[in-house]
Amino acid sequence: MEEDEDQFLLSSLGVTSANPEDLEQKILDEATKKPDNDEGGSVEEKSTQLEGTNLLSSSQNELLNKLRAVKFEIDAVASTVENVDEIAAEKGLKKDDESDLQGLHSGSALQHALATDRLRSLKKRKIQLEKELTGLHGQSASSSADHGNLLRDLVKEKPSLKRKLKEIRKPSRRDGKKVKVVSFREDTDFDAVFDGASAGFVETERDELVRKGILTPFHKLDGFERRLQQPGPSNSRNLPEGDDENEDSSIIDRAVQSMSLAAKARPTTKLLDAEDLPKLEPPTAPFRRLRKLYKTPNSPDNEAKKRKAGKKSKKTRPLPEKKWRKRISREDSSLQGSGDGRRILTTSSCEEEELDDFDDADDNERSSVQLEGGLNIPECIFRKLFDYQRVGVQWLWELHCQRAGGIIGDEMGLGKTIQVLSFLGSLHFSKMYKPSIIICPVTLLRQWRREAQKWYPDFHVEILHDSAQDSGHGKGQGKASESDYDSESSVDSDHEPKSKNTKKWDSLLNRVLNSESGLLITTYEQLRLQGEKLLNIEWGYAVLDEGHRIRNPNSDITLVCKQLQTVHRIIMTGAPIQNKLTELWSLFDFVFPGKLGVLPVFEAEFSVPITVGGYANASPLQVSTAYRCAVVLRDLIMPYLLRRMKADVNAHLTKKTEHVLFCSLTVEQRSTYRAFLASSEVEQIFDGNRNSLYGIDVMRKICNHPDLLEREHSHQNPDYGNPERSGKMKVVAEVLKVWKQQGHRVLLFSQTQQMLDILESFLVANEYSYRRMDGLTPVKQRMALIDEFNNSEDMFVFVLTTKVGGLGTNLTGANRVIIFDPDWNPSNDMQARERAWRIGQKKDVTVYRLITRGTIEEKVYHRQIYKHFLTNKILKNPQQRRFFKARDMKDLFILKDDGDSNASTETSNIFSQLAEEINIVGVQSDKKPESDTQLALHKTAEGSSEQTDVEMTDKTGEAMDEETNILKSLFDAHGIHSAVNHDAIMNANDEEEKMRLEHQASQVAQRAAEALRQSRMLRSRESISVPTWTGRSGCAGAPSSVRRRFGSTVNSRLTQTGDKPSAIKNGISAGLSSGKAPSSAELLNRIRGSREQAIGVGLEQPQSSFPSSSGSSSRVGSLQPEVLIRKICSFVQQKGGSADTTSIVNHFRDIVSFNDKQLFKNLLKEIATLEKDQNRSFWVLKSEYKD
């Protein structure tokens, strides 16, 4: 029924819809059927007639490709297992001898267990594929060795499709580097690994079940897993083997059922196109007003309101109704005056039902479900959790038993808050709870409190924020923002200076700490301001909601968060990884300090090899090394990152349909747009004399409404914001009219407050009931506005800025969403959608995204699609590019001619580009979509898990930007696999050479793992509340000389008040002061220089791009401290654990420069002590470095 309504509405708007999945499948089928066609000039020659060639069937080809990919990963994982075994053998390590849990799990035990399990699964998968192949072509199971010969015959006999040689452009700053020529040809090995790893690294059965929320990453790992105890009087922990098998089969059955339910509930996305586009106007027409002014319809009620208002011209926003404001006030007062807020708190009917469950449970001595190790989950909580949420609670308990933290990276709207609160409540129920702290955006403070009282009413919740204490707070927040766009800093910061009254929060903190169920909720800004108080407390748990806020390892808020005194740290984020490996390191260094070592070592041993391996001119050794380093890194981090998608779990979500509407520019918009493109400002942008963001901002304002350019001078004009001058507003007017008649309720998002002003005037003029929330909305009113909209059917529209409130804002009262203008960052648009389409939504959701055809907005949308193609299901939310290349800039500042009858939207070309990209990875087609209908591709989160992974190749021959290469190299495993096998075939044709390269790559990966182990060892000597050394900030894990230089300065904002040196007591060292010693700057320059030198050398001399263990092969010059200390340690170990000064000096004479002499001494003293006997003196390694 609703689909018919949508079709009728879209027909009235002059647009048509199409199913993107059908279109994509059609294009892929065409590309598969005609693999020998020329597409877009990317292939130079068509394939010749294949006579006398016995080609395998498509199914056999597919199985062969998968088999080859599995074999390649088996080799990589096997080397990791062997490496861990060697380290364990050298140290004589036995699992039973490990008494310190932290030391055990930060060592090699878990990595070895995971790698062994993965190896077992891969071998099982290999046998299965070989059996399938045997059944296909009638060979015996023992003939699997012939598959390699068959593949070589295929490669040999099948004519190769040659591409143009692409010359890598020589950067101006690297004039001395030699130019390499790379030939891109279709190759069976290239296709094999691409097809076999289209979803990332080869997905094992464990990986699939974890992704679908059925198992935890620690399933069946002895010493790590904490299973549900079986009900019954015995309540035994160790189940018989038969029960284990039955459990496995039941898990598989649940997985199949879950997959089928998820497939049925999977939402669809539709592609839309505007018809009857207006003809092109003359190049530059002067901006003009409409002769007919847009005024509010005259009615008796309106006239009465005007007379009542008198001369009052200031427009005030509508406030939530009195009953909703009173509700928030009662919540604040009740929780401040009572330790048990659940008896006083006003609740909704569903919340009252929850409290009744707890009251009944009190009378019956609450029943519970027990996990191994003693965690009791109250039955009233357990039965209300979805299966994947129960797995999440189990995973949190497994981390707790390891005294480690983790990242809950579930997709937005899957209930991360519920999982955390259920776990904390279970800890309290099991008598294991200590007062904990939750840090979140300011808009979510009351939502956290309400959810805590709903899911576990025994919590004593306190909010440390002025908005929850002072009724008058927020009155001074009405000043206009200097920025046109709401940002993270402007939307969710507290906008307040540090309070002069340092004892203001003492009583509140005492109430939390003195309560056995104390739970403190505060914001990131308050944590920074009140660091003296909050950082001196030993918390049970520290939870960061929207934890991607600490992705910058050197920012103040990151360093403050990392000083919280607890080993139990949880990050909640719907966008777990952004762009760089550095951001990955920062998040993991919070939840598991030292897991990835110190940042300089991590960058030198992992980031640089992975980055170099992603370059277009990387050698086979470099590419193979990058892959093996990525394998090591994956096994380190995956158990501590839980990421489930809506498409993979049975989340009981309603259907969601998303439309992308391409709107046409009005006459005024087009003339203004063309006038700007012809202006001197654009010329200055091209010349580099003006910031490009200025021009982009102007064009985006024109797309929204041309009046925004004259806001300061014309906002009082009665005709300001006339919807007839905006193509998108004309569409909004028609859509809202129909939705109002159909009884739907709407969320209307825009990025800017200025555009919200125009939309608000439009809503007032049409007498629509509405509410508004943006960065200037007082914090105390935000929850009341949300409550009113979710519970009052009278509210028709809620207008918001895209970023206000963060990812966790729940607006399920709406079932229609309009995203007025797209964001560079696709996650911002996604989070706007997720406000309505999440757990708790009872109706089907329809989303309209408005994009102005042929303008900057379509290019923004195009780049959103590009980002979705470049990322896999773990890295779902990359940021936009921070800069543009010259050709990108010129591409942005154009307007497509709408007068061309054959013109199409830029987005419609994505499909033809998709087919071209498919050709690059092995299948070819020059057949385009049969119609010239303009198409818009919107890759939603649930849809992209099914999308065909496509390797995006730079057509101009230049390497992609560094961030993209990192993503493709580490997690987009088909990119890694493809590069590995392609280069191996092109540059190393014989098996002996391949084996030699793999051996060398394995050695480099082993050295990287060893460097990380040593770095972790250094880091573990410091308290968990001391920030890890990043090369610029922190001191934990840094060499002693660096620690003296970098650790001597503390953050003045944390220590400038107070009488006692509490900050020094906690080891606070959040950043550098402006008066640092020159030697620190020199050290930083040397680190930067050596890192750049390592990359540069890796490009031209791949086989010497990584530090060798022998001194003779090392380069003379300055070395990174972490590299030098490893060399010293290795040398002394080779000498039996002790060496005299003369031998040490002679060995390092050619390695250490004169400027590094003092650094060398300090590093030597760090790992060894000088001992003397009657005849001589010698350096002896300290005990922790002997093995």
Curated annotation (Swiss-Prot):
Biased composition (Basic and acidic residues): 23-48, 492-501
Residue runs in coiled coils: 110-170, 987-1016
Binding positions (ATP): 410-417
SMART domains: DEXDc, HELICc
Pfam families attached to this UniProt entry: Helicase_C, SNF2-rel_dom
Cell location: Nucleus
Compositional bias annotation for Polar residues: 9-19, 1050-1059
Biased composition (Basic residues): 305-328
UniProt keyword annotation of Transferase present: no
Positions occupied by motif Nuclear localization signal 1: 162-169
Stored SUPFAM superfamilies: P-loop containing nucleoside triphosphate hydrolases
Induction, as annotated: Accumulates after genotoxic agents treatment such as bleomycin (BLM), a small peptide that create DNA double strand breaks (DSBs).
Enzyme Commission number(s) from the entry: 3.6.4.-
GO CC annotations, alphabetized: nucleus
Domain Helicase ATP-binding: 397-594
Annotated function: Essential factor involved in transcription-coupled nucleotide excision repair (TCR) which allows RNA polymerase II-blocking lesions to be rapidly removed from the transcribed strand of active genes. Upon DNA-binding, it locally modifies DNA conformation by wrapping the DNA around itself, thereby modifying the interface between stalled RNA polymerase II and DNA. It is required for transcription-coupled repair complex formation.
Oligomer and partners: Homodimer. Binds DNA.
Family named by the database record: Belongs to the SNF2/RAD54 helicase family.
Descriptive protein name: Protein CHROMATIN REMODELING 8
Organism of this sequence: Arabidopsis thaliana (Mouse-ear cress)
Organism taxonomic ancestry: Eukaryota, Viridiplantae, Streptophyta, Embryophyta, Tracheophyta
Originating gene: CHR8
